[in-house]
Amino acid sequence: MSTPYYPHPIIAREGWPFIAGAFAVALLVQFMAGWLWALPFWLIALFVLQFFRDPPRVVPALAGAVLAPADGRIVAVDKVQDPYLPREALKVSVFMNVFNVHSNRSPVDGEIRNRWYFPGNFLNASLPKASLENERNALWIRTDGGQDVTCVQIAGLIAKRIVCHVHPGEHLARGQRFGFIRFGSRVDVYLPLGTKVNVAIGDKVYATQTVLAEFH
């Protein structure tokens, strides 16, 4: 196992405006109406603070491993048509509820070959049709071993903002942070047929730490 340099604050930058706003409202209500009226606002502020936590993770030193791109629960393991590349693929979907860490991390080492953004709906991200109907951002990653992996950030019922910090031509390392989805969402990973999947529907997974699958 190896712990890479993690150049990110423990509270994600994507959340700083929301955190500042939540605490400012709580302070204002306490000043204007007292602590009893302010208590619900302080609880909301603390919830927002914990939502944007972004702890470093240990990267498994396992050759050929495909790592979980997000914390959450497995809601789909299917053989499907990849919506982004002309192929059949294995789809593994991770659903994040509002209590999970929402930082998104690369499942593999590889070069970003393309990136697509699609505006869309904000259906419950645990539903199968959310993969194709919700707002989403897709990355096509060509691994260092030549495998094609598609990693898709999908907005959810509450999530209204997908953040992706990387672009075609850049190289990602396994476990490298590449984006964030605010307030409930999902990440789909499309893998080549023949990849050994190590998870099942209902399993809890943790970004970078859980090995979703292995290339042969």
UniProtKB/Swiss-Prot annotation:
<feature type="active site" description="Schiff-base intermediate with substrate; via pyruvic acid">
    <location>
        <position position="185"/>
    </location>
</feature>
<keyword id="KW-0472">Membrane</keyword>
<feature type="modified residue" description="Pyruvic acid (Ser); by autocatalysis">
    <location>
        <position position="185"/>
    </location>
</feature>
<dbReference type="InterPro" id="IPR003817">
    <property type="entry name" value="PS_Dcarbxylase"/>
</dbReference>
<protein>
    <recommendedName>
        <fullName>Phosphatidylserine decarboxylase proenzyme</fullName>
        <ecNumber>4.1.1.65</ecNumber>
    </recommendedName>
</protein>
<keyword id="KW-1003">Cell membrane</keyword>
<keyword id="KW-0670">Pyruvate</keyword>
<dbReference type="GO" id="GO:0006646">
    <property type="term" value="P:phosphatidylethanolamine biosynthetic process"/>
</dbReference>
<dbReference type="Pfam" id="PF02666">
    <property type="entry name" value="PS_Dcarbxylase"/>
</dbReference>
<keyword id="KW-0865">Zymogen</keyword>
<keyword id="KW-0210">Decarboxylase</keyword>
<dbReference type="GO" id="GO:0005886">
    <property type="term" value="C:plasma membrane"/>
</dbReference>
<comment type="similarity">
    <text>Belongs to the phosphatidylserine decarboxylase family. PSD-A subfamily.</text>
</comment>
<keyword id="KW-0456">Lyase</keyword>
<comment type="subunit">
    <text>Heterodimer of a large membrane-associated beta subunit and a small pyruvoyl-containing alpha subunit.</text>
</comment>
<dbReference type="GO" id="GO:0004609">
    <property type="term" value="F:phosphatidylserine decarboxylase activity"/>
</dbReference>
<comment type="pathway">
    <text>Phospholipid metabolism; phosphatidylethanolamine biosynthesis; phosphatidylethanolamine from CDP-diacylglycerol: step 2/2.</text>
</comment>
<comment type="function">
    <text>Catalyzes the formation of phosphatidylethanolamine (PtdEtn) from phosphatidylserine (PtdSer).</text>
</comment>
<keyword id="KW-0444">Lipid biosynthesis</keyword>
<keyword id="KW-0594">Phospholipid biosynthesis</keyword>
<dbReference type="InterPro" id="IPR033175">
    <property type="entry name" value="PSD-A"/>
</dbReference>
<keyword id="KW-0443">Lipid metabolism</keyword>
<keyword id="KW-1208">Phospholipid metabolism</keyword>
<feature type="site" description="Cleavage (non-hydrolytic); by autocatalysis">
    <location>
        <begin position="184"/>
        <end position="185"/>
    </location>
</feature>
